[in-house]
């Protein structure tokens, strides 16, 4: 059973202010974590909890949230502290009261995502490995995009599938794809700062209509991967994509590359 006094004390130590929470309120934490709203009547925090062994997952998420927040392009829940409590790991972050998208909300999200993608570096990858969902995501830094995607994304996923007993035609097709991968990915993108897991469940709007992104799997990579992820499960709507294109048009061939 969670001892909320331990987490409250950690919050107080981090903020330098006393924090005596009321009864915690369970909220949606996704399909992986337990989510709890913890407040004292003045301040509210969102606490994500999971097994103790997954503390590193939360610490990597906090690093990613900070990196995204530094761009000041989209609203990001600010991480506060993380740790262990009675055999569980936790991550405490700013609680963002969610509302509904305004008429122009989707366009604003597209425009600001393009601005975030303008933050680049010379190498593809990230300062540490992290997770996408609860699956490990290797981020070894590399100077070229195609080898990075081949080894750290597609190749790693095929290897993971094989270790878990998945084979047959899908595995065979994947191996053939790896053999011809450089030919299929003949473009040299900049290494943009990416959310890394930007499907519809990880974008919302606060009470003022400002877009908020969360639950990242951050790394520097081809911005097209963020856009391709948004198209899963229904997409983000025409206003979003039109605004992104107006801010920073995608390179020719995206419609073919996005399937990878």
Model-derived features with residue positions:
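Active-site Asp-x-Gly
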Residues: 138-141, 145-150, 159, 190-193, ...
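Conserved Rossmann-like nucleotide-binding pocket used by diverse enzymes
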Residues: 92, 194, 259
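Alpha-helical structural elements of signaling/regulatory helical domains
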Residues: 71-74, 101, 166, 236, ...
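Conserved N-terminal boundary motif of the eukaryotic protein kinase catalytic domain
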Residues: 18-25
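Short glycine/proline-enriched loop/turn "hinge" motifs that connect secondary-structure elements
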Residues: 81-85, 253-256, 260
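ATP-binding pocket architecture of kinase catalytic cores
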Residues: 25-147
